[in-house]
Amino acid sequence: MHEKTKLLNLTSDVIFKNFFMNENTIEYTAEFINLITGIPKEEIMKKAVFENIELPIINKNSKRYKCDIIIGIAKQLINLEMNASYYEGIIEKNNSYLFRMLGDRFNKGENYIDGKKIIQINIDNYKKYKGDKLLYRFTIKEDETLELETENYESYHISLPYLKEKCYNKEKLSRLQENNNELYQKIIALLIKFYYYYGSNY
């Protein structure tokens, strides 16, 4: 490993937020969002705005919702969540962020078709879903026809254990790169950059 290389613990709340919101790494953030969602990197670089992470409170008895990172772009709101460990209720907690943001998109008098698309990207430091994959995409579909109910929101889950297992085994990593498409390879390469960030910002 390069002597100036620092191994980042991205599951740390402070490092995760600092890294993704740091002006020195904004290009990585834009590339990351682009690879996951398909939103053009240039558009993200030009129009991205870091939003208030505390969602509006409806009344005094409402539960407070405080997200990790929210990035507003022209037609999308991106919610990045680092899930350092699994516990019962974590999926429901993150879904509550997503659906709360979905409901808060509109002001009085606004057209329902003009709201921003809500996209949640979860980086999971645990294995939860079947298939032994790096990236999982979730939407709401009809059971038999697989028709999308709406395109107004979607959520992604990235498996860090999957990445670690492949990266620490050169044979598996080589096979992984051979067997997966170009998009997968780019995501893997970018996540490796996140773990091995050159510089002294941290």
List each language-model region with its residue ranges.
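Elongated, amphipathic alpha-helical interaction scaffolds
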Residues: 1-202
